[in-house]
Every structure is written in C-alpha cells, then in structure tokens.
Amino acid sequence: MTHLTRVSAINWNRIDDDKDLEVWNRLTSNFWLPEKVPLSNDIPAWQTLSAAEQQLTIRVFTGLTLLDTIQNTVGAPALMADALTPHEEAVLSNISFMEAVHARSYSSIFSTLCHSKEVDAAFAWSESCDPLQRKAQLMLDYYQADEPLKKKIASVFLESFLFYSGFWLPMYFSSRGKLTNTADLIRLIIRDEAVHGYYIGYKYQKGLEIVSPGKREELKKFALDLLMDLYDNELAYSRELYGESGWFDDVSAFLCYNANKALMNLGYEALFPAEMAAVNPAILAALSPNADENHDFFSGSGSSYVIGKMEETADDDWDF
C-alpha cells in the first residue's frame, strides 16, 4: 500500500484542464437522491406484472447493483490513483459517490415494490449466475492491473455498454406505461452514466496523445478484443435473463447500439453495422429526456423529483 507523505490543497481557480471543471459542474448540477422519486406510485403497476416479469425485473436490478458496487468501490478509486490533476481526482470521487447512490437506488426500488424473500433470492441468483460473475471478474481484473489506459477502456465499457442490458427492461415497461416512476429514476442513472462514460473516454483520448503510435495501435486492438469478449458474455447474460420472454433480439440490438457508443466515447469508430444496432423506436423514445411528462430530465425538476429553492421573504409576504 502507498502511504502519502504530503497532500497539497486543491485550487479550483488554477485548472490545467477546463474539462474537469465543466464535468464537475455538470455532475453537481445533476445531483439527485432516490428518496425524492415517488416509487410507491408504481405499486399498482408492479402488481399487474406476471410473476416471471417481476422476477426478471428484480434480477436485472440486482445485476445492475453489482456493477454499480464495483464501480463505486473498485473502479472509480482505481482511476483516481492514475489521475493527472487534483481536479480530475475530485471529479472521479464524485463519480464514485454517485455510483453508490445508484446502487442505493435499486435497494429503494426493492424495498418499495418487492418482498424481501424475492430480493434475497435474486441476490443469491447473482452469486451463481456465471455470465454476471464473469463480467464482474473481468472488470476487477483490469481495474487491479497496472495499465492506466486499459483501466479507462474497461471503465468506459462498463459505464457505456455493460449497464444497458439491464437498462433496457425499465425502458421497455415505461414505453408501455408501466413502472413510469421507476423509469424516471433509471433515466437519472442513465444521465449520470452518460457523463461518466464521456468523461473517462475523454481522459483516455488525452492519454493517447502522449503515447507512441505503436502503443496506440496496441490499445485499440486491446479495446476491440475486450469489447468482443464482453459482448459475447453479455449475449449469454441477456439470454439467461430474457431468453424465455421473447425480448432477447430487441435487447441484443440495444447492446450493439450502446457498444458502438462506448467505442465512440473512446474515440473509435462504431463496430456493429446499423442493421445489428437497430433499436426498437419505442425504446429510444423512452430513453428520450422528454419521454415522461412527470420528469424534467436535465433540470432535475418535475413532479417526480423536486429540490426546493430558498427565497428571501418580506413581512408583507405573510399578510393573508
């Protein structure tokens, strides 16, 4: 373990990379907590789902919880160790915290909609689900390795690709008017993950600028090989989750769509052709910031999530 002997105070008035402040401001302005989303409004819709749909939903959210836990406790801290500026380190600490909020959010969904025994069964399932455990181990292996740029590649794939086999389901239900408040919460998570993937991809591209052309080619090959390994595993995971639902093909297209986005965050061209990444328009509409009238996606306001604003009052404000 490395023991610090000296820490310098961070000075936000002397910034080496303006992107650090830009992303810090975006993340802090996007701040939210699950307690502000009225998940209990989804109880009637939850009760209309079949037992199989309920089990699928709980398993999907359990898998997402595992990925958020990895990113919170291992992934973002591993990237912090490679930060080039204190401001980058601060942004990554914010990312780490919000991943903990995301993990907490799924527990809020569980405690609101589900019976404890059903949730316990899903967590037990997650420990024995081979594709889920394999992708978790792949992430841990790269986060615990010594190559900073490879860590960033793995992190972008987690943020911009691996989450989306799970995100598909609440968007599907939302497109059919079910679990709409849960979908509001998931959109908040997706909004965060989009910024995380963009920022870490940006830092990766900055890192490429200072390595040799040969190293750049090596890293590109590594990224493509890792993506295909993760993609094959994600197909297996999605088949285990969605195989009996009839939704597997739609989920597969969503995977290709987001794999291409992950590559673009790294500065690479899309890999999967348009016909493989043709997402159901209803899912894309559900992903839209304006998909649900209950929620203002960018401002964090709306009927489902409201932060009060303070305003000074005068004596005559109280004359009724």
Model-derived features with residue positions:
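Non-heme di-metal
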Residues: M1-F320
